[in-house]
Structure formats: structure tokens, C-alpha cells
Amino acid sequence: IPQKTDAQYFFPPFVFANAKAYLHYSKINKVYSCYGEEGVYFDFLQKDDEAIDDSAQAPTYHIHTDLQQESEHFGAIVEKAKEYIRSGDVFQVVLSEQLCLATNLDSLTFYRLLSQANPSPYMFHFPTPYGDVVGSSPEILVDITGNQIHIAPIAGSRPRGKDANEDVRLEQELLSDPKECAEHRMLVDLARNDIGKFAEKGSVSVKNMMHVLRYQHIMHIVSDVYGNKRADVSPF
């Protein structure tokens, strides 16, 4: 599938960074951990008892994308993706659109507001030569702890209900949806295949198959796929 060339800004598909130092913050334990010889970069954390100024100028946004035009264009992309699937070129394709907007927020302030509006297990903020990357995701790409490889496929979702009873109803509806379940099983199979390329023979297993995790605004079907890493395989 060719790379799209009419993007409104350039950002490479991959950025490899050899960071001098990085910071990890556990929101559950409220613990900062600094790694690297240049941990002095994070000395400001010693002042983390100072209140954050929430009286700053209210955020403003101006959308530069023609949403109507993008919606019409997206329909054509869907049809093209179906052709790729029918021809056997792809098993799975993720379609996306680029939304560009101007704002008076710096990236760190945007990250802070994002963490309040959409708290997720995996949030990140890091600068690159092409721009700052900020994100909020419920899903890991891959976790390697010791010799264990872990992937947690997420596919299938419903919004959170207005109360506990509606949450239960939506969860049951989600788990009985043939399309959502088929998509999730496909991702579990892909995760098993991916881990199997680097794991010891016979060590790949699936646990907690198709359980539902609830987040602030949405619920997802999640499974856990594990394997024991071969001795000749590194995290890279």
C-alpha cells in the first residue's frame, strides 16, 4: 500500500531515539523514576509539591481540516481497503485520517489536559526533531519482562454506560457481537504468530481470553498472549 503523500505536515513512520535520560511516572503509586546519566534534567521534580497554575489562558483551537471533504474521501479509502483484502494483499488494515488544528497550548500543557480528559494506562510525551509526540493509549505494543514476552490485543469496543446496569448491558452486547468477536480473535491469532517468531517452541499461550476492561469513556475486549523469549532474542 503506497505511502500517502498529501499530508499537511511530515512526520516519519518510525523515530528511533537513543535517549540520554527518560522519566517514568506511575500514576497509581505516584512515583517518579529517572533513568540515564543525565537525570539532572528532571531536577524540577523536586518541586512537584508546587501547585500547577490552572489559571492560565483558556485553550483555543482552530481546525485546519475540511471535515466534510475528509469524510467523503474516507469512503473511497474504505472501498480501496476492501479491494486489498479481497485480493489477499492484507489481512488487516487500519484506516485513519489526519486532523490538523492550531492551538495556543504547548505540548506539555496539552499532555496534562489530555491525561485529565482521557486517562489511560500508557501516556507519553517526548520531543523529536519533527515535533513533539503526545499520546494516550490503553494498549501496549509489546512488554518484555525477564524472558517473558507479553502482547495484549485490544479489539471490540463500546462506550461506557450512564450507570452500572447500562455498563453490564453494553458489555454483554459487545461480547455477543459476531463482528467484534471475529475481529478480536483475528488479532489474538496475529499476536500468537508474532510472539511465536521469537519465543521458545511450545511456550506461547493465551490467558484471560476476551475479557472486558472498562476505562473512563470506553470499554474494550482484551486478551493476554504470552511466550518465553528465546535466549538469542533481545528486546530490539
Question: Where in this protein do the model-derived segments appear?
Answer:
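Extended alpha-helical targeting/anchoring segments
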Residues: 1-236
